[in-house]
A protein has these predicted regions:
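C-terminal peripheral helix-coil segments that are non-catalytic and often amphipathic
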Residues: 1-16, 145-152, 181-205
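Amphipathic alpha-helical linker/stalk segments
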Residues: 78-103
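Amphipathic alpha-helical packing segments from all-alpha helical-bundle domains
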Residues: 128-170, 194-201
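Basic, helix-initiating cap at the start of DNA-binding domains
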Residues: 1-56, 73-76
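Amphipathic alpha-helical segments used for helix-helix packing
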Residues: 75, 110-134, 145-148, 177-178
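Alpha-helical DNA-contacting segments of helix-turn-helix folds
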Residues: 40, 72-82, 125, 135, ...
Length: 205
């Protein structure tokens, strides 16, 4: 018996509408995030509000709230993009001898790629850290994974990966906050982060 079942046109139209709606939602979200970055580049974290974001992106305040119910959620979304960029293409676990250097190089490249914005995100996340609700813009979990994977003799300070990673992240945060506050240029920040990754004299780098 021949199969007479045909695809329901109304079902296909529904799928197409759902896809368009999903694409439009993603596009609007990205528009809002890029508009938020523009505000941060031109001003400070205190300039980023639902009103300013709506004005910059050309959407209503209600639309802004639909995607981001408060300013904190905007900062968290922007911070997630930074952390995801650090994670991207990072092969873990890795037994390569240069895994730590590769990670440090990748992290530096991400942070200075849009330093005017990311400096503001670091300050915002530091201000909200006490509440426990803002995601900190530092890759501590990634660093621990990298240090755990490398050979014991290559771990700075201690063979214990937790101790080694904790020491490096302490140095890294010092460099990060100094850079975010404007005490370090991008080049000086890179030098200090490489110091954190090797725990050596920065003048020897």
């Amino acid at each position: 018996m021949a199969n007479t079942t045909s695809r329901d046109p109304s079902s296909a139209r529904t799928v197409a509408r759902q896809r368009r709606a999903r694409d439009e939602k993603l596009a609007t979200r990205e528009l809002l995030l890029e508009s938020a970055r523009t505000i941060l580049r031109d001003g400070s974290l205190f300039d980023l509000t639902a009103i300013s974001l709506g004005h910059q992106s050309g959407v209503t305040r209600q639309t802004v709230y639909r995607y981001f119910p408060n300013t904190e959620s905007i900062f968290k979304a922007l911070s997630d993009d930074v952390i995801n960029a650090v994670y991207e293409d990072l092969q873990l676990p890795s037994d390569k001898e240069d895994a730590l250097d590769h990670f440090v190089t990748k992290a530096i490249a991400v942070f200075v790629s849009d330093s005017a914005v990311i400096r503001q995100l670091v300050l915002a996340s530091a201000m909200g850290r006490a509440t426990g609700s803002w995601r900190q813009v530092d890759p501590e979990d990634i660093l621990l994974a990298v240090v755990t994977d490398i050979a014991e003799e290559q771990r700075p300070v201690s063979k214990d990966p937790v101790v080694s990673a904790r020491m490096m992240i302490t140095y890294f945060r010092g460099a990060l906050y100094g850079w975010a506050a404007g005490f370090y240029s991008d080049e000086e920040f890179e030098k200090q982060v490489r110091l954190a990754g090797r725990l050596t004299d920065p003048d020897a780098i």
